[in-house]
Amino acid sequence: MDVNSEPVKKVLSKYKFRDVAVEELQKVYRVYPDMKIMAGTYTSSDSLQKDLLKLVGNIPVVYQGRSYNIPILLWLLDSFPFTPPICYLRPTSSMVIREGKHVDSKGRIHLPALHNWDHPKSSVNALLAEMIGKFEEEPPLGTKSSAHGDTPSNLLDYVSNLTITEGGNRPDQEVKVSVIGGGDLGIAAVLSIMAKSCVDKLVLIDIPENSTKGGTMDLEIFSLPKVEVSKDLSASAGSKVLVITANAWSDEQSYLSVVQTNVDMYRGIIPRLAQLSPNAVLVIASQPVDVMTHVAWRQSHLLPTQVIGVGCNLDSQRLSHIINISLVANNTGKQAWVIGELSENKVAVWGNMGPGTDQLQALTPVSNSTKPLMDRAFEMIKGRGQRSWSVGLSIADITHSIVTNQKKVHSVTTLAEGWGGIGSKVFLSLPCILGETGSTRLPGVALGSEDEMKLRESVACQVNLFMQLRL
């Protein structure tokens, strides 16, 4: 493998572990002598460009007794081999990518070896061996339909009629939901969603957290219909909803360092989840939910309507229930909502309901005549806390509205920029209509001075925190 060409030497000189990288490349050459090392410009998903090395070549795949060559490309980051390659298929103009469990619609390859990369235990040769094994189970390429009678060759002539049943959100696909996080909240979310009977398949992905848990193992022992337990993020491919319950908490850390730990954990899972299920709605339940929903949106590069947090949905449902029991709201055409940050700064407002419907038409601030009632009800819900099982029920409520396209209103964490004069990119709980494509935020409302101050304080705190976080 020629690493002495001027373009390669120029780029390689900027690599942090040059000698180790060259040694790893030589190992690849001994097993795959046709692989070529080249210099190129890599463009990331956020349009940033960087000069990197890339491995280009074919890997041999045997499918049903026949051997085929699969063209691939591996981008090597400047911290290679201590960071995994970014792997893509290299289809020609006559090829079509077969989106599946290990390949997304853009041809990016997702494998356990990449997710669990740990050099020197991990190597490119081992990665390629796993890639070959996965592609032998599920061929990743086919041919495009040709009006000119072109003769397909190699793998394409054999797999052009194969139907890949996994990956992507197609109209005829089963309703699949994935819960990422194996702690008590993850288990509660799984059981609550299953009780709603609104999904065909539910995947619980158990990722490492700084907590003691045994529920995931119990689910594996006492298996439930429609529930799959996995440790591989790729099992979530093709999900309609991705629920993130994972937390990396520690009582020994400062608040900033605890949040940063969660941000770092998200960096390892959110981008890949978004790539595996690009049409999914992300429902964030990690804490602090307002901050982590913002982080998930930034890291996933999804539309803001596709990323929501559980936010004040539970508090809103509790508040409404308490007020309805008092028989005050039954004849007023109003419903109580909790909005803002999930903290002491959350705010209660009224929602005007459409005549004879459950559709929210507009929000109104609490008037002097209804303030005593609202204050008493608000104090009652503050003491109830947010235990795993209750948050799990709230997650199921939100998930049900999304997968059944109910167009129901929930107070969920969403991008608040532009709502009620908020000028910063922050996430707060606001009433949103939820459906299969995500959330639609309802118009803002003029709040009283005290409530307005609470919202502004929440915005300022979030802005200040994000200035200190490493995303």
UniProtKB/Swiss-Prot annotation:
Keyword NAD: yes
Known role: Possible negative regulator of polyubiquitination.
Gene: uevld
GO cellular component terms attached to this protein's record: ESCRT I complex
CDD domains per UniProt: LDH_1 (cd05293), UEV_TSG101-like (cd11685)
Domain UEV: 2-145
Gene3D superfamilies given in the database record: Lactate dehydrogenase/glycoside hydrolase, family 4, C-terminal (3.90.110.10), NAD(P)-binding Rossmann-like Domain (3.40.50.720), Ubiquitin Conjugating Enzyme (3.10.110.10)
Domain of life: Eukaryota
Residues annotated for NAD(+) binding in this entry: 183-211
Protein name: Ubiquitin-conjugating enzyme E2 variant 3
PROSITE patterns per record: UEV
InterPro entries xref list: L-lactate/malate_DH, Lactate/malate_DH_C, Lactate/malate_DH_N, Lactate_DH/Glyco_Ohase_4_C, NAD(P)-bd_dom_sf, UBQ-conjugating_enzyme/RWD, UEV_N
Family note: In the N-terminal section; belongs to the ubiquitin-conjugating enzyme family. UEV subfamily.
Lineage: Eukaryota, Metazoa, Chordata, Craniata, Vertebrata
Signal sequence segment: none
Record PANTHER family: L-2-HYDROXYCARBOXYLATE DEHYDROGENASE (NAD(P)(+)), UBIQUITIN-CONJUGATING ENZYME E2 VARIANT 3
NAD as UniProt keyword: yes
Quaternary state and interactors: Homodimer.
GO biological process, one term: endosome to lysosome transport
Keywords: NAD, Ubl conjugation pathway
Any one GO molecular-function label of the UniProt entry: oxidoreductase activity, acting on the CH-OH group of donors, NAD or NADP as acceptor
